[in-house]
């Protein structure tokens, strides 16, 4: 309570129930008397928790509110005091019923002087003499209380129920109206302050239902209507329709307060009854957010014919209906507040939506000016305006919300629509906000307009998020929660949102694509939707890169990683330096790590990679395949001499030539081919010297010559991990194969060393012992099963096979071989998945057949687990005889065995093997359908691996310490010892400087990192702007083409109708009953039928109507009268009324406009209106 900042930091708690001391006050106020206390709360608190005044209780010698001033001689006074204390202790909000607190936080209108004088007289009767401090505070609180809070002497019970104003005789209409307005004003003042304490203290189920039953009558009396209520599916509490969304969003955030006990409430009532004062408690109903409350102003009664007037575009009728509805409802500025039913609220919403959808902007302005729509109606109207692509209407709606400063819409409140069940009937899916819809439709103008107003799309929480918002949303409606996430991601992954809401649109597309790919794995039920959005992000990055216009922009885009991705795990190792003169290409390598195949396979990226790959060898790309093979063969033969030359002089002309990526690739490939040749040589030597290798007479070095290359490979992989980083190293599956191969080689070599060591140890002391003979001269037939040489030879055989398969790493350098290599990789994945099903079925039949034939042992291939497995395995390939399962002397086991063997053959050979073939074919076809992208992506990864600085010398020459390495080591030691300043530690640029917009050819060598980053962002924004302009031009062109197609169809329709109308005209002129031709259209048949139906009504038609014989295009409306009068003439519609419901539009020819063209009567009942 009384705690300074020093005490708070040191943990000295000075709170407690005690009297104030002089040390608790400041020095100027020490020793002085005081009659009031001012409390300042400086500790932070959340808006969802009750304001911390419930713990405050002040007592003094003059009296206390907790101990009412009662005559000591009165019976039961001690009991009243005790009960009153219990009330404050058990009441969850004792400070709300405190008159002093209510006077400070909830000021009310003044009461009448007569009531105050009566209360003052009662207080003097209770306490003769001058009034005490408690009596003065009660009197002051009564002055601020509403008239209904003071109980007359005739009614001293203070029971809850209707107030004195309600029980009295009804007054005139105008005073009642003023009283209602006063109550509304008091509610407006009280609600913001009341929300500090009870905005999030939501009741539990039992308490919530009890309070709702208590509050419903009061709400009904205040509003004058029935308030619709809904049940929260989370806590099962009843709340009004408007407060339910806000409650559901924060339900369960803080523990509900405990209600006061009945005994305490009764004692409190007795105390108030003794004072003859009843303070009306404020209803603690959770107040909704201002964004979801109805705008308090005049509410019009919905006219039934308004929708028809809007549909027909009759502006005057709409204004007349709104004015008449306003007069009929009496909802002027001073009129009573009337609840609007849900159906009527929906009608107003449909009226506004219809006006927007039909494009009647003037009618929309009239509705917005005369009708006060709440946030939900404006929200749906915005969606309709965005859906119909009307930026002007969107501006009007946003301006309407902007003018309501007191109820200004918070853009975060759009998420509360999830908990609003009143908009479930909307045509828009859950989670669709105006900005989300605009982005989904790629409406750049509307999206930019909404973003300028502060609208954003909040990124959904992770799938496994267990926060209060996500848990409440799942419990409220799981389907709406899932659809809301999908629709939100549709908006985020749209081209408009990526272009307008991201500073680096390309990087945002990469990161979002990776996130959507992960969500597709975590939420397989929505995998197709996530995969489609991920493909959309890849296409956006591909198209954005295509907006580059010069090499400077390409260099700026591909060479910078981006500040937002520097902390990403996939960006590890992307800051490494490349060879001298080779740009960093950090953005391109990030795209490779993010698996952006479309972006990497873009012609711009491939051109950059190909130019770096060839280096100064300009003629390499245009040379023939024979010449390339000849150069590769020369490098293969001279590989040792080239490596020695580079080792001696790395900065010479030969050294710079070997640093070119394509030559480095050929050099390393030649080294690996030499390694495979040595492996083949060792195998051939073992065949020629079989007697030597059959026993233990060979030495370790004779069988381990390949370990020279293995040592070089091990050092190469260590340097690669050091340069790239462990995570980036493990992202490549070929590195896993390298680790396995090296591990097996080292294990084989270690076993041979172990064998040699054991032979030396056992033969050192006793050379003629049995153990020494076993490890030196024993024959192979005498070796034990776990002999080290057995294991070493087996491991070496497996490793040799894997070493040859490692040669497939260089196949992506060729287009045809690279595509086959990718297809084989996909097929291996299919086979691994297929093996799970295969092993399940094979194990099932293995157990069944083995259990049948074990007791009989009639066959060598059945009855034993290992033999049965081999028999079934080779049966899949048709290499076993079916007579093996025969047992003539045992009919029942033989029948079951044959049946099981037949079923196994059908399932494995016919079903599963064909299914495997279909899977492999499908994978191969997928690669072939996108072979160009797949091959270019694989080739790009191969190219990038040879762009790095270092690793120029191939295996095994890289294990030799080079003079360059020694020079770098000495220079690093010298810098560490002699130059420890920060200037020496400054990192150089990883790529050459780039030009600027003003001078693309200039070298920005002196430009800082900030200028380079700024230039990159300017390039990205320029690309985005070009992309937006291109999208707009394509949209306009598509719309023009669509309009042209419609005009062409309209022209054909007019030509066809011309002939039909001419035929009708000829028949009418002949005066007979025309018969429609067989090929006549529906319109022609309809006109003919109308003429035949009314041929005997009205005056005759002239033989040659002037308007039908004039060529030209005119739109004619043919309508039937709604009824006939007594004379047989068609009844004309009254002015202002809509036309007939049955109408048809006919296009006829006209040569020139007829002045004052009016209605053309056909047979008196066929009415045509011509418009030029």
From Swiss-Prot:
Compositional bias annotation for Polar residues: 75-87, 195-204
UniProt GO cellular component terms: dendrite membrane; endomembrane system; endoplasmic reticulum membrane; Golgi membrane; nuclear envelope; nucleus; plasma membrane
Domain of life: Eukaryota
Gene3D superfamilies: Ankyrin repeat-containing domain, Galactose-binding domain-like
Tissues/organs with expression: Isoform 3 is ubiquitously expressed at low levels. Isoform 4 is expressed exclusively in vomeronasal organ.
Mode of membrane association: Multi-pass membrane protein
Compositional bias per record (Basic and acidic residues), positions renumbered to this chain: 1-10, 166-177
InterPro entries registered for this protein in UniProt: Ankyrin_rpt-contain_sf (IPR036770), Galactose-bd-like_sf (IPR008979), Ion_trans_dom (IPR005821), TRP_dom (IPR013555), TRPC2_channel (IPR005458), TRPC_channel (IPR002153), Xrcc1_N (IPR002706)
Biased composition range(s): Low complexity: 261-270, 1130-1144
Annotated region described as Disordered, given as residue ranges: 1-22, 69-98, 140-227, 249-271, 1118-1172
Knocked-out gene: effects: Reduced electrophysiological response to pheromone mixtures in the vomeronasal organ. Mutant males and nursing females are docile and fail to initiate aggressive attacks on intruder males. Males display normal mating behavior towards females but display increased sexual behavior towards prepubescent females even when presented simultaneously with adult estrus females and also show increased sexual behavior towards juvenile and adult males. Lack of response to Esp1.
Keywords (A to Z) from UniProt: ANK repeat, Calcium, Calcium channel, Calcium transport, Ion channel, Ion transport, Membrane, Repeat, Transmembrane, Transmembrane helix, Transport
Phosphoprotein is among the record's keywords: no
Cytoplasmic side: 1-659, 724-738, 811-833, 921-1172
Protein location: Membrane
Official protein name in the record: Short transient receptor potential channel 2
Organism, scientific name: Mus musculus
High-level lineage: Eukaryota, Metazoa, Chordata, Craniata, Vertebrata
Gene: Trpc2
């Amino acid at each position: 309570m009384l705690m300074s900042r020093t005490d708070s930091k040191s943990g000295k708690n000075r709170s407690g129930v005690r009297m104030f001391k002089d040390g608790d006050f400041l020095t100027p106020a020490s020793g002085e008397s005081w009659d009031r206390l001012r409390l300042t709360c400086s500790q932070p608190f959340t808006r969802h928790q009750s304001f911390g005044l419930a713990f405050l209780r002040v007592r003094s010698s003059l009296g206390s509110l907790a101990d009412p001033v009662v005559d000591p001689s009165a019976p039961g006074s001690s009991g009243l005091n005790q009960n009153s204390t219990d009330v404050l202790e058990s009441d969850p909000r004792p400070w709300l019923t405190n008159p002093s607190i209510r006077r400070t936080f909830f000021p009310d209108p003044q009461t009448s002087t007569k009531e105050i004088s009566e209360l003052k007289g009662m207080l003097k009767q209770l306490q003769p003499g001058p009034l005490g401090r408690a009596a003065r505070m009660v009197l002051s609180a009564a002055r601020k209380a509403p008239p209904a809070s003071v109980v007359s002497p005739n009614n001293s019970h203070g029971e809850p129920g209707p107030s004195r104003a309600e029980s009295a005789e009804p007054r005139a209409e105008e005073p009642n109206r003023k009283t209602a307005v006063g109550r509304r004003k008091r509610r407006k003042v009280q609600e913001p302050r009341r929300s500090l304490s009870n905005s999030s203290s939501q009741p539990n189920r039992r308490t919530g239902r009890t309070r709702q039953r208590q509050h419903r009558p009061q709400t009904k009396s205040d509003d004058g209507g029935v308030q619709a209520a809904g049940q929260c599916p989370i806590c099962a509490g009843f709340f009004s329709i408007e407060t339910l969304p806000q409650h559901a969003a924060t339900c369960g955030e803080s523990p509900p307060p405990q209600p006061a006990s009945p005994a305490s409430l009764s004692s409190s009532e007795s105390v108030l009854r003794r004072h003859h004062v009843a303070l009306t408690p404020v209803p603690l109903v959770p107040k909704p957010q201002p964004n979801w409350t109805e705008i308090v102003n005049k509410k019009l009664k919905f006219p039934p014919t308004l929708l028809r007037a809007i549909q027909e575009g009759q502006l005057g009728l709409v204004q007349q209906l709104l004015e008449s509805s306003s007069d009929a409802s009496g909802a002027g500025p001073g009129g009573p507040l009337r609840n609007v039913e849900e159906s009527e609220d929906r009608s107003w919403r449909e009226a506004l939506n219809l006006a927007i959808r039909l494009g009647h902007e003037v009618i929309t302005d009239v509705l917005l000016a005369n009708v006060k729509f709440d946030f939900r109606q404006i929200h749906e109207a915005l969606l309709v305006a965005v859906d119909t692509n009307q930026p002007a209407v969107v501006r009007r709606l946003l301006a309407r919300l902007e003018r309501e400063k007191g109820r200004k819409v918070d853009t975060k409140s759009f998420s509360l629509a999830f908990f609003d069940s009143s908009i479930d009937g909307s045509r828009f899916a859950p989670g669709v906000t105006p900005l989300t819809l605009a982005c989904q439709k790629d409406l750049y103008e509307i999206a930019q307009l909404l973003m300028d107003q502060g609208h954003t799309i909040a990124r959904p929480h992770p799938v496994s998020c267990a926060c209060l918002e996500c848990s409440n949303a799942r419990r409220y409606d799981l389907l709406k929660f899932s659809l809301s996430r999908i629709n939100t991601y549709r908006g985020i992954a749209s081209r408009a949102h990526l272009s307008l809401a991201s500073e680096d649109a390309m990087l945002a597309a990469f990161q979002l694509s990776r996130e959507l790919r992960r969500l597709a794995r975590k939420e397989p039920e929505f995998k197709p939707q996530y995969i489609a959005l991920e493909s959309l992000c890849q296409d956006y990055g591909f198209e954005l890169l295509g907006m580059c216009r010069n090499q400077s922009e390409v260099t700026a885009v591909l060479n910078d990683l981006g500040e937002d991705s520097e902390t990403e795990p996939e960006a590890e190792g992307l800051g490494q330096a490349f060879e001298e003169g080779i740009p960093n290409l950090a953005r391109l390598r990030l795209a490779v790590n993010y698996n952006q195949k479309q972006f990497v396979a873009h012609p711009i990226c491939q051109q950059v990679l190909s130019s770096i790959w060839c280096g100064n060898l300009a003629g390499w790309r245009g040379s023939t395949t024979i010449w390339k093979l000849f150069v590769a063969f020369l490098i293969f033969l001279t590989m040792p001499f080239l490596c020695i030359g580079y080792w001696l002089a790395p900065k010479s002309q030969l050294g710079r030539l070997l640093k070119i990526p394509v030559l480095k690739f050929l050099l390393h490939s030649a080294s690996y081919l030499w390694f495979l040749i040595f492996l083949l040589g060792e195998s051939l030597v073992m065949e020629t010297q079989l007697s030597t290798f059959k026993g233990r007479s060979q030495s370790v070095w004779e069988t381990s010559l390949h370990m020279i290359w293995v040592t070089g490979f091990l050092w190469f992989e260590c340097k690669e991990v050091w340069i790239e980083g462990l995570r980036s190293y493990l992202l490549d599956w070929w590195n896993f194969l390298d680790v396995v191969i090296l591990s097996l080689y080292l294990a084989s070599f270690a076993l041979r060393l172990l064998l040699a060591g054991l032979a030396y140890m056992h033969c050192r002391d006793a050379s003629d012992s049995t153990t020494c003979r076993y490890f030196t001269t024993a024959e192979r037939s005498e070796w034990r099963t776990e002999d080290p040489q057995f294991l070493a030879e087996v491991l070496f055989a497996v490793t040799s096979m894997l070493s040859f398969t490692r040669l497939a790493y260089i196949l992506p350098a060729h287009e045809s071989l690279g595509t086959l290599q990718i297809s084989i990789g996909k097929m291996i994945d299919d086979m691994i998945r297929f093996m799970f099903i295969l092993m399940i079925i094979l194990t099932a039949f293995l157990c069944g057949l083995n259990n049948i034939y074990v007791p009989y042992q009639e066959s060598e291939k059945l009855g034993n687990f290992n033999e049965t497995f081999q028999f079934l395995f080779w049966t899949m390939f048709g290499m076993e005889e079916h007579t093996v399962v025969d047992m003539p002397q045992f009919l029942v086991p033989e029948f079951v065995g044959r049946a099981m063997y037949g079923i196994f053959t059908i399932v494995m050979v016919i079903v599963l093997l064909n299914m495997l073939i279909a899977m492999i074919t499908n994978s191969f076809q997928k690669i072939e359908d996108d072979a160009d992208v797949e091959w270019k992506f694989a080739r790009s990864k191969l190219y990038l691996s040879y762009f790095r600085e270092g690793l120029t010398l191939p295996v095994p020459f890289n294990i030799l310490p080079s003079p360059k390495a020694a020079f770098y080591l000495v220079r690093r030691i010298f810098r560490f010892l002699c130059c420890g300043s920060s200037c020496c530690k400054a990192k150089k640029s990883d790529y050459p400087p780039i030009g600027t917009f003003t001078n693309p050819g200039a070298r920005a060598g002196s430009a800082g990192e900030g200028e380079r980053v700024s230039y990159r962002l300017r390039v990205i924004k320029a690309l985005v702007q070009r992309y937006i302009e291109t999208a707009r031009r394509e949209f306009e062109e598509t719309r023009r083409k669509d309009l042209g197609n419609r005009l062409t169809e309209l022209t054909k329709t007019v030509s066809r109708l011309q002939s039909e109308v001419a035929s009708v005209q000829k028949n009418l002129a002949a005066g007979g009953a025309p018969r429609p031709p067989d090929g006549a259209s529906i319109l022609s048949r309809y006109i003919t039928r109308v003429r035949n139906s009314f041929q005997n009504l009205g005056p005759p038609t002239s033989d040659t109507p002037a308007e039908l014989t004039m060529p030209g295009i005119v739109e004619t409306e043919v309508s039937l009268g709604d009824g006939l009068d007594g004379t047989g003439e068609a009844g004309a519609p009254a002015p202002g009324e809509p036309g007939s419901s049955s109408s048809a539009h006919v296009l006829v020819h006209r040569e020139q406009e007829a002045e004052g063209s009016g209605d053309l009567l056909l047979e008196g009942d066929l009415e045509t209106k011509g418009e030029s």
